[in-house]
């Protein structure tokens, strides 16, 4: 009989897992920590990695040093992705907050991104309700509620009707 092969150290398994996770898409540091600490599905069901908190810190710092993990890059790409899907600034900020991104980083990236939120709100309203946009009060309320849900600010929503009246 052959002896079972020894398992790799926890640090090496964590590092391998982190690189595989980050190869798929960018993650925030908090997301990566959460995914690394979750059990891994093995051949015999979920397996815990017996890693110490120091192992996790070493993996996170290695990912930062080798530019696999960069919260600023993540924020910029996340804003671009969510805005392309039609979400507004309030919703994007809230989602970034849930992902553990500091408010300062979010605000800096929002200022740097070149997005006309009122035009985006108008595009979403036209896509959902058609051209011309509704003009009765009850229909305007529906459009407003939809855009607020999507994360647009009231100023951007009101801008739609100011421009529409011109």
UniProtKB/Swiss-Prot annotation:
Compartment(s) of residence: Cytoplasm
Entry superkingdom: Bacteria
Primary location: cytoplasm
This protein's UniProt keywords: Cytoplasm
Transmembrane segment boundaries: none
GO biological process: regulation of DNA repair
A cellular-component GO term for this protein: cytoplasm
Record keyword GTP-binding present: no
Tagged with keyword Glycoprotein: no
Task of the protein: Modulates RecA activity.
Family in the record: Belongs to the RecX family.
Name of the featured protein: Regulatory protein RecX
UniProt source species: Salmonella arizonae (strain ATCC BAA-731 / CDC346-86 / RSK2980)
